[in-house]
């Protein structure tokens, strides 16, 4: 028997042994062979395209400039500079914890699959095949079958519900991320118009119209999956080029200004400007952290591209991409912020501006047209970020549908709906149902919030905290619910029998920090951004949480009956 045949024999034997375990002890997830043989993704993502989609999505230097209004009002340049250091450190810890899981259990469902696998209680001991010299094909086939939901023994409602909740938290976090990108791009376009027409008065419906138009255009780019690796690489190169050009042009242009003196370093690194109304500068600093934290949103995107990378390669590529994205994001955003803050000649005008970054460009260059050009480069980069976010959210929903359709009664609405979301449309090789449903959700969010600045803050806070919760739950289960040493030994003994060993040690420290950071953000980012609190400036993030958990309850409840 050849090696590939032996791998399939292992999967068959596992299902046979599980089938003899009494039903009262387990609920096996089963999918028909026809469901498993449907259209699959092409494995056409490599290191550069995977890094491209991850970095294009977070795009820290653009994120920090697009949401600068909150940070500037909460503490000025000092908050953003030191906030970036804080956000980068904790994001790195979260990234390491994600990389730990992705290295041993590659699956496009990400955290939801890891939770499902960690809570698995094996009733029988299965012997895995051993090879003297396994080939790459053997390794890929084995991992693709081993790291699938239909090969996980589901023995409790807690296991089932926990994994689904994590998957849905991750998905809604991605949805709100796309919404925040559309909103920031709309504000960027309006900021250009304001610069060229100083008498312009901002209306909320202007932001709303721009939001919906941008969302409609972004929808078109994820219909075909074939160009996505090239778009991702284009986004990576465009982002780095735009960063370099805008930074250099601003610094050089500011150097030619002999009228206005350079700001003192003490004003940038040591002066805290609290305009929030909070009496406590510490509290003002904390609520303003939403700006630098948003610069590192979506660091898990690479974990959801496993099907388009390959299960074998992803064990090594995904952790490296996550860490590289965070490090490069911090370096570019930190340099960018420090440089541009030295270009400010009138901080009051920056604070009062519709879009502070455009005002900084104008103060640095003294030329409206050149400032518009620089902002257009940022918009182009942000547009690719929106495409990457659309890819990310559709992959989460597609993998969720594929993994959890069997949890529902065959023929039920939930079963049929998730099966539909899992389908890849032939010819497009893209999950169009998942993609269009996700874009509709983004459209609905825009209709609810109608372009208010308070709504934008709630959107970016929701995307931060929902994603962090989806990162923290697997870490919490790994540390405090299961016997972690036994789990690691079991996975390594299963996977490394055919796959090349991955010598990663899962340290407790990043997982503990990830949990604590999530709790911190969940509590403190829910406080009002400014005082006194009115209906217009209230932090509505808690309302978002309530709605999201109501929807999650409706989706998950039928699986518990």
UniProtKB/Swiss-Prot annotation:
It is found in: Membrane. The chain crosses the membrane at residues 50-70, 78-98, 161-181, 205-225, 231-251, 282-302, 322-342, 370-390, 440-460, 462-482, 508-528, 541-560. GO terms for cellular component: endoplasmic reticulum; membrane. It is a multi-pass membrane protein. One of its GO terms (biological process) is gamma-aminobutyric acid transport. Keywords: Membrane, Transmembrane, Transmembrane helix, Transport. Residues 71-77, 182-204, 252-281, 343-369, 461, 529-540 are extracellular. Disulfide bonds: none annotated. One of its GO terms (molecular function) is gamma-aminobutyric acid transmembrane transporter activity. Signal peptide: none annotated. Residues 1-49, 99-160, 226-230, 303-321, 391-439, 483-507, 561 are cytoplasmic. Transport into the cell of 7-keto 8-aminopelargonic acid. This is 7-keto 8-aminopelargonic acid transporter. The gene is BIO5.
